């Protein structure tokens, strides 16, 4: 604990203690040692096929651009966010890619410390540079959906003091911004080296619970559960994503 406190103080003279979870306006419901969310079966069996009907077709696998009809599974199944929001609280977040996080006491920055076990589907570790690249691409690339730029518009800059630490500096106090940043979808910096426009039909390299298998453009897409998913035993993931195959058609 002493080492952790010294580490936090090294970033800023106005820092708060690292947290496993945060709630907006209230303490998080779940304790630090929770095993799984109450609404899931932590020992649920794995297997089977889950087919989901989709209204309309799709013409792109890139979920971040404004143009095109998006395929349904890429963002929800193959990409992890910094944190995970529980479904039985107004607005609370718990660790996923970020194992802990904190809002500075002055309210002008938020820091996320990455889980050292996190890795992308290509085997690369999830590093601070990937988080920074994801944020910058989504908020600065002209082809990106403007939602991202608006949603995080009070972020002045992002810093990466080391491979596992990401600091977001704010333009002004914003009561919800640190929570909104937890919803950042993180993908490898190798995903779109030439920007989103040239990668308009390219899916990101993610770290999520499923991997893309195949698709019939506009009609069907299929995903397989990653049996080596790095986060499968985290409390925010235990008992979830149980089907071996998920199919949209």
What are these regions (language model features)?
Residues 27, 39, 55-58, 66, ...:
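Solvent-exposed coil/turn segments that connect beta secondary-structure elements
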Residues 79-89, 181-245:
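Gly/Pro-rich hinge or "lid" segments in bacterial periplasmic/extracellular proteins
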Residues 19-21, 47-56, 99, 109-111, ...:
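Short, well-ordered beta-strand elements
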Residues 113, 149-193, 209-216:
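Surface-exposed binding/hinge segments that line
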Residues 3-12:
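Sec-dependent N-terminal signal peptides
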Residues 19-106, 136, 205:
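N-terminal lobe/hinge region of extracytoplasmic solute-binding protein
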Residues 14-18:
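Sec/Tat signal peptide C-region and signal peptidase I cleavage site
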């Amino acid at each position: 604990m002493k080492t952790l406190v010294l580490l936090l103080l090294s970033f800023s003279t106005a820092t708060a203690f690292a947290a496993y979870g945060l709630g907006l306006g209230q303490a998080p419901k779940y304790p630090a040692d929770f095993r799984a969310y109450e609404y899931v079966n932590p020992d649920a069996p794995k297997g089977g096929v889950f087919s989901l009907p989709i209204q309309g077709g799709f013409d792109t696998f890139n979920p971040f651009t404004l143009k095109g009809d998006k395929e349904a599974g890429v963002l929800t199944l193959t990409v992890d966010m910094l944190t995970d929001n529980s479904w039985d609280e107004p607005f609370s977040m718990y660790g996923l890619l970020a194992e802990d996080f904190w809002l500075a006491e002055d309210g002008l920055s938020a820091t996320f410390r990455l889980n050292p076990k996190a890795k992308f589907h290509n085997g690369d570790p999830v590093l601070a540079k990937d988080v920074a690249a994801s944020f910058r691409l989504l908020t600065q690339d002209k082809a990106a959906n403007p939602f991202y730029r608006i949603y995080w518009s009070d972020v002045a800059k992002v810093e990466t003091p080391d491979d596992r630490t990401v600091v977001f500096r704010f333009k002004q106090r914003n009561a919800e911004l640190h929570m909104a940043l937890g919803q950042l979808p993180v993908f490898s910096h190798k995903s779109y080296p030439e920007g989103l426009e040239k990668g308009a039909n390219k899916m990101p390299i993610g770290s999520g619970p499923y991997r893309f298998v195949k698709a019939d453009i506009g009609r069907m897409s299929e995903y397989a559960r990653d049996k080596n998913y790095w986060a499968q035993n985290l409390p925010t993931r235990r008992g979830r994503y149980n089907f071996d195959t998920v199919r949209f058609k």
